[in-house]
């Protein structure tokens, strides 16, 4: 018996089509209907009166409350002065990924050694303002400075030893970088 290849292919396809039509896999989908939804509970909506607003004239909405007394705020020395014990920095020592803490909020900052503007490119990841605007960084002596897209300083930090930097943002928020 001599069978041609095309005849064998035709018989195989016919068998495949016939077997596909006889399956019951798809017929069971038509028989099952979803369970009916339970009706939402019927109830009555009630309303209450809002408390009356503060009496007019008792407070002036345009005035801020007085600042609390005896507050202690940590600060860095004025610009250009490094804290005692701060070490000289190099770009290689700063390059990498840092865990940043800005006023108690955490994020990550990447500081690769890719040249960008007057320093190196930087990339914040899920950072709060103003640190979310970091575009570059550079070191000068003992100081690490983080810059925005216009070259304005967003934060100045100094090495606190090991793999840690402490400083403050341009608006006075404390910031630290750790690895």
From Swiss-Prot:
Example of a GO MF term: endopeptidase inhibitor activity
Spans annotated as Disordered: 24-88, 158-179
Signal peptide span: 1-20
GO cellular component: cell outer membrane
Protein origin, superkingdom: Bacteria
Keyword terms: Cell outer membrane, Lipoprotein, Membrane, Palmitate, Signal
UniProt feature, compositional bias: Polar residues: 160-179
Annotated membrane topology: Lipid-anchor
Designated name of the protein: Outer membrane lipoprotein omp19 homolog
Natural source organism: Mesorhizobium japonicum (strain LMG 29417 / CECT 9101 / MAFF 303099)
UniProt gene name: omp19
């Amino acid at each position: 018996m001599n069978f041609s290849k095309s005849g064998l292919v035709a018989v195989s396809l016919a068998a495949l089509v016939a077997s596909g039509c006889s399956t019951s896999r798809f017929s069971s989908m038509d028989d099952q209907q979803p369970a009916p939804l339970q009706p939402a509970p019927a109830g009555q909506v009630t309303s209450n009166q809002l408390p009356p607003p503060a009496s007019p004239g008792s407070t002036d909405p345009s005035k801020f409350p007085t600042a609390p007394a005896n507050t202690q705020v940590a600060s860095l020395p004025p610009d250009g002065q490094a804290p005692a014990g701060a070490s000289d920095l190099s770009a290689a020592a700063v390059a990498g990924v840092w865990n940043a803490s800005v006023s108690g909020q955490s994020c990550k900052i990447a500081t690769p050694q890719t040249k960008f503007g007057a320093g190196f490119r930087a990339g914040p990841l899920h950072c709060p303002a103003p640190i979310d605007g970091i575009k570059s960084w550079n070191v000068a002596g003992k100081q690490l400075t983080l810059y925005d897209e216009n070259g304005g300083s967003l934060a100045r930090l100094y090495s606190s030893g090991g793999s840690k930097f402490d400083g403050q943002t341009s608006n006075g928020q404390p910031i630290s970088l750790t690895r």
